[in-house]
């Protein structure tokens, strides 16, 4: 993935390299970097507005309405009272946090009839982009003469931090300096961070998650993947902590909502915050991703999710607690499966090797050997030498850091003992995790994860807990060891842990927690991870240097071609058209779906396709009102916009900058898109904004929200 400087310096996994050249109109473009070439192509596709209507330093623009929702999604401001539309799966954690067995908003949905009924969501934030400024010269000027890549990265991070500090951001702003274009350029970015965010409306999961894991990444799609929140501000309309006295935020700009629909080949544009892509990855990097990251992830998550699913199916309270965690895990699990299939189907490794041969020919014919001569060979060497460590780290991360939860809990517990000054923050984080945790379920997960670790990691790299405890005291029986941990440790149990914390002073607590079985396990796992990381880092720096030089070389090789920077969860736009596609020979997928498909798919015996009767009746009677087009209600649509994870909730705009949908997924046939964009196959799946309004109006009976919007 595209790595930030701090991730490179602190990361626990190998970094990836770069290759591949995207066409000028296929990319995730920085709005402040759009040029005449981009505009000409946008005009050709049907765009009608001036460029500064998208992003401007000195006047309101569409970018002012697009937000980072939570920690990894996008949202769009749609009213002058801070109303935000995003995806249901983006709001899923917030919906779950407010759900109980008696008030199950995941199952039944949530409708606030007044602003007073809107529910505050502790910990949820919304970020508005304030400005983005290129600072490449200021950073690069401090890097001259540094030849060691590790030192170069450290110095770059130091300079970036200094530039961010000089911005004098207040406590309600986030100021960062990010590397772009494979660490060849740098931009300073400032966000306003709003922390009073309230839940306004959520459809039932039978709508917002219709199709479940079966339909995830698939087309045709009939998912009403949306939820509604509101941003509140202080009396001065600036960000403020939650207060009952706060008022709805008055945004600089909000999006108008189109009721006009779309047809095939109409202009479509997304703006959002894509998380990471690897479009310049080399063939060796692609092999590494498949063998040493995706394959381990598929294996581990499949086993973990099977254990979770069985427990969730048997008990409603467990389902609520684990719903969000399961969805997040399964999403990336299925993505990895689809990515591997797509990479093979499209022969991406073969394409990358052809690109590498072209790069090598350019170097030879243009006398560039002194600068770029060893770039490809150094990348090949680094990937091959680092493959073993990367695979081991992925297995360790997926099993004991990301599989069983008790190891992470123990890390928090140990941090309380070793960082008493940060006591309140650590304890709050731990308590937040306790709310959605079942020790009895994790007791089943732990031995399954330990068994995978033993099978997949060499004996000399295993955490020493295997040799010293599991083998010595339990004769290798991981189930008996897991029972021991959960019987003797206080860490998995909120009540026991808090009782211990309250009954001891800091010194006694530190001594006691050090001997806790879960903490001993955690320390052993961390030590093993550090040893593997040490093996990985030398190759990681070599890969990072190769990436930087390879991209710089590509820019020289193609001087007249705009090469978009890989995604790094900063604001990007993508322009394209409404289009269906051919998934396989002899088949064609239409560019939109309708309510007819909901009735065809619905199945009361399936937890993924069951829909409440009162919703089905709306489809049966075709009670669509003004939201219909030719007597049908459009549910979802396709466009060839370029998106990835992080774009969830991104607004889809028409040629006039009006909202026509919310992006929520990509298609199964193009899961390789983070590495190789395939214009004939890759599609963005979006929920039609008219279906969103239909659910708010006809099902939710919430006209106050419709009245807030600017409908055109």
Swiss-Prot record:
Q: Temperature annotation for this entry?
A: Optimum temperature is 43 degrees Celsius, using Ala-Phe-pNA as substrate.
User: What does UniProt list as catalytic?
Assistant: 89 (charge relay system), 225 (charge relay system), 648 (charge relay system)
Give the species: Porphyromonas gingivalis (strain ATCC 33277 / DSM 20709 / CIP 103683 / JCM 12257 / NCTC 11834 / 2561)
Similarity comment text for this entry: Belongs to the peptidase S46 family.
Which Pfam families does this entry report, sorted A to Z?
A: Peptidase_S46
Instruction: Note the site residues: Critical for substrate specificity of DPP7.
Output: 666
What's the reported outcome of changing residue 666 to D? Nearly abolishes catalytic activity toward Met-Leu-MCA
Protein keywords: Aminopeptidase, Cell outer membrane, Coiled coil, Hydrolase, Membrane, Protease, Serine protease, Signal
Protein name per Swiss-Prot or TrEMBL: Dipeptidyl-peptidase 7
The protein's matches in PANTHER family, at most eight in alphabetical order, are given as: PERIPLASMIC PEPTIDASE SUBFAMILY S1B
Q: Which GO terms describe its cellular component?
A: cell outer membrane
What EC number(s) is this enzyme filed under?
Answer: 3.4.14.-
Question: Where is it localised?
Answer: Cell outer membrane
Provide the coiled-coil residue spans.
136-173
Q: What does this protein do?
A: Catalyzes the removal of dipeptides from the N-terminus of oligopeptides. Shows a broad specificity for both aliphatic and aromatic residues in the P1 position, with glycine or proline being not acceptable in this position. Most potently cleaves the synthetic substrate Met-Leu-methylcoumaryl-7-amide (Met-Leu-MCA), Leu-Arg-MCA and Lys-Ala-MCA to a lesser extent. Is likely involved in amino acid metabolism and bacterial growth of asaccharolytic P.gingivalis, that utilizes amino acids from extracellular proteinaceous nutrients as energy and carbon sources.
Broad class of where this protein is predominantly found: membrane
Q: How does activity depend on pH?
A: Is active against Ala-Phe-pNA over a broad pH range, from neutral to basic pH (6.5-9.0).
What is the top-level taxon of the source organism? Bacteria
Impact reported for residue 666 to A: 61% of wild-type catalytic activity toward Met-Leu-MCA
Instruction: Offer one example of a GO biological process linked to this entry.
Output: peptide catabolic process
Alphabetized InterPro entries for the sequence: Pep_S46, Peptidase_S1_PA, Peptidase_S1_PA_chymotrypsin
Question: Which positions carry the signal peptide feature in this UniProt record?
Answer: 1-23
Q: Which Gene3D superfamilies match?
A: Trypsin-like serine proteases
The protein's GO terms of the molecular function aspect are: dipeptidyl-peptidase activity; peptide binding; serine-type aminopeptidase activity; serine-type peptidase activity
């Amino acid at each position: 993935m595209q790595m930030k400087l701090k991730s490179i310096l602190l990361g626990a996994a190998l970094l990836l390299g770069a290759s591949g050249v995207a066409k000028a109109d296929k990319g995730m473009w920085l709005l402040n970097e759009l040029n005449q070439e981009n505009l000409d192509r946008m005009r050709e596709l049907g765009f009608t507005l001036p460029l500064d209507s998208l992003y401007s330093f000195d006047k309101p623009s569409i970018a002012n309405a697009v937000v980072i929702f939570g920690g990894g999604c996008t949202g769009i401001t749609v009213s002058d009272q801070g109303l935000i539309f995003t995806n249901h799966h983006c709001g899923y954690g917030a919906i779950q946090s407010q759900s109980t067995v008696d008030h199950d908003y995941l199952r039944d949905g949530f409708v606030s009839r007044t602003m007073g009924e809107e529910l505050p969501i502790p910990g949820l934030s919304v970020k508005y982009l304030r400005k983005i400024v290129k600072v490449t010269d200021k950073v690069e000027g401090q890097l001259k003469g540094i030849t060691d890549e590790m030192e170069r990265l450290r110095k770059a991070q130091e300079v970036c931090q200094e530039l961010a500090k000089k911005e004098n951001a207040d406590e309600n702003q986030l100021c960062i300096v990010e590397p772009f274009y494979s660490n060849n350029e740098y931009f300073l970015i400032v966000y306003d961070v709003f922390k009073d965010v309230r839940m306004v409306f959520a459809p039932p999961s039978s709508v917002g998650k219709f199709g479940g894991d079966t339909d995830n990444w698939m087309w045709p799609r009939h998912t009403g993947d949306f939820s509604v929140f509101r941003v509140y501000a202080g009396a001065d309309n600036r960000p403020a902590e939650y207060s009952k006295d706060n008022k709805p935020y008055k945004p600089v700009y909000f999006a108008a909502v189109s009721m006009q629909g779309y047809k095939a080949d109409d202009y479509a544009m997304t703006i959002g915050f894509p998380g990471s892509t690897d479009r310049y990855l080399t063939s060796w990097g692609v092999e590494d991703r498949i063998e040493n990251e995706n394959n381990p992830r598929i294996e581990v998550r499949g086993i973990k999710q099977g254990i979770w699913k069985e427990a969730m199916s048997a008990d409603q309270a467990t389902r609520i607690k684990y719903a969000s965690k399961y969805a997040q895990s399964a999403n990336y699990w299925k993505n990895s499966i689809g990515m591997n299939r797509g990479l093979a189907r499209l022969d991406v490794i073969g394409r990358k090797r052809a690109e590498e041969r072209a790069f090598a020919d350019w170097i030879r014919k243009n006398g560039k050997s002194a600068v770029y001569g060893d770039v490809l060979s150094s990348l090949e060497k680094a990937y091959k030498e680092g493959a073993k460590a990367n695979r081991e780290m992925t297995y360790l991360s997926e099993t004991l850091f990301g599989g069983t939860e008790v190891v992470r809990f123990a890390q928090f517990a140990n941090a309380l003992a070793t960082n008493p000054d940060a006591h309140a923050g650590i304890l709050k984080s731990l308590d937040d995790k306790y709310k959605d945790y079942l020790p009895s379920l994790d007791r089943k997960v732990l031995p399954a994860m330990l068994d995978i670790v033993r099978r997949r990691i060499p004996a000399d790299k295993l955490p020493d807990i295997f040799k010293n405890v599991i083998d010595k005291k339990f004769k290798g029986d991981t189930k008996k060891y897991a029972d021991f941990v959960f019987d003797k440790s206080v860490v998995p149990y909120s009540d026991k842990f808090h009782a211990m914390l309250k009954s001891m002073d800091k010194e006694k607590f530190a001594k006691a927690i050090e001997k806790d079985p879960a903490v001993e396990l955690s320390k052993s796992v961390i030590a093993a991870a550090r040893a593997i990381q040490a093996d990985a880092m030398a190759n990681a720096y070599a890969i990072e240097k190769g990436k930087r030089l390879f991209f710089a070389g590509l820019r020289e090789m193609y001087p007249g071609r705009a090469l978009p920077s890989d995604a790094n969860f900063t604001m990007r736009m993508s322009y394209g058209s409404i289009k269906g596609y051919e998934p396989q020979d002899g088949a064609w997928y239409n560019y939109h779906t309708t309510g007819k498909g909901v009735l065809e798919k619905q199945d009361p015996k399936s937890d993924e396709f069951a829909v409440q009767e009162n919703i089905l009746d709306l489809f049966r009677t075709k009670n669509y009102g003004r939201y219909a087009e030719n007597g049908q209600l459009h549910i979802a649509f396709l466009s060839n916009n370029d998106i990835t994870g992080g774009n969830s909730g991104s607004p889809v705009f028409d040629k006039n900058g009006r909202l026509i949908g919310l992006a929520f997924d990509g298609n199964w046939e193009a899961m390789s898109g983070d590495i190789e964009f395939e214009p004939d196959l890759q599609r963005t799946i979006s929920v039609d904004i008219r279906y969103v309004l239909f659910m708010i109006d006809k099902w939710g009976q919430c006209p106050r929200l419709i009245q807030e919007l600017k409908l055109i």
